[in-house]
Amino acid sequence: MLTCKQYELLLFIHNHMKETGVPPSFDEMKTALELTSKSGIHRLITALEERGFIRRLPNRARAVEVIRLPEKITFNLSSARKISPSVIENNKRKISKNSDNFDLEEKKNIIIPIMGRIAAAVPISAIQQQINTLCLPQDMISLGEHYALEVKDDSMIEAGILDKDIIIVRRQNTATSGEIIIALIDKEEVTFKRYRRKGNSITLEAANPHYETRIYRPERVQIQGKLIGLIRKY
């Protein structure tokens, strides 16, 4: 698994070579990654080489070749943008792009996919294709598979979730009453709401009086994941 800085450098080298035909210089890499010394770039390149993503060609200046890319980013690498969080709202911890959380020596960073945009009701296809990636300190999420979604409405505003926030979701198919979930309705429509189990029915509650509460038979609802946090960029 790549750290956030390793991923960022690999992406930068690939795109630079695609645009210019030559690898970037160490100074260009240092500037792009906002590092203060070339030694940090040397360590990142060594780590990428050891993991089989790049190789250095001997006796040639600026001779770095990208051998392969992580599978999750090869589909749309030229337009992908890595997002670093500014605020993680579930524990109010602030992170800056230059924070030690994203330093080369920090080995507990992970990259999760942003799988589309979610609203009160969208087709399932809206969250089935990765549109971006998100770099997070690993200690901010729990065990399991995670993904992110961009919020596109104000249906959960009274729960502190705003339009354009990015929500972090742990993939799971069960939930406790009162938790905010991603739900698939009738295998066609996806929504994110507060989950309530009441007898032989499931209630999905918005956190905005302008949106209706929906009640379903259990067989119509499939839980796709549970909200564990959100990121808000200022």
UniProtKB/Swiss-Prot annotation:
GO terms for molecular function: DNA binding; serine-type endopeptidase activity. Residues 26-46 bind DNA. InterPro entries: LexA, LexA-like, LexA/Signal_pep-like_sf, LexA_DNA-bd_dom, LexA_repressor, Peptidase_S24_LexA, Peptidase_S24_S26A/B/C, WH-like_DNA-bd_sf. The active site is at 155 (for autocatalytic cleavage activity), 193 (for autocatalytic cleavage activity). The keyword Transcription regulation applies. Its EC number is 3.4.21.88. It catalyses: Hydrolysis of Ala-|-Gly bond in repressor LexA. Pfam families: LexA_DNA_bind, Peptidase_S24. The keyword Magnesium does not apply. Keywords: Autocatalytic cleavage, DNA damage, DNA repair, DNA replication, DNA-binding, Hydrolase, Repressor, SOS response, Transcription, Transcription regulation. GO terms for biological process: DNA repair; DNA replication; negative regulation of DNA-templated transcription; proteolysis; SOS response. NCBIfam families: lexA. Belongs to the peptidase S24 family. Represses a number of genes involved in the response to DNA damage (SOS response), including recA and lexA. In the presence of single-stranded DNA, RecA interacts with LexA causing an autocatalytic cleavage which disrupts the DNA-binding part of LexA, leading to derepression of the SOS regulon and eventually DNA repair. Homodimer. This is LexA repressor. It comes from Bartonella henselae (strain ATCC 49882 / DSM 28221 / CCUG 30454 / Houston 1). The lineage of its organism: Bacteria, Pseudomonadati, Pseudomonadota, Alphaproteobacteria, Hyphomicrobiales.
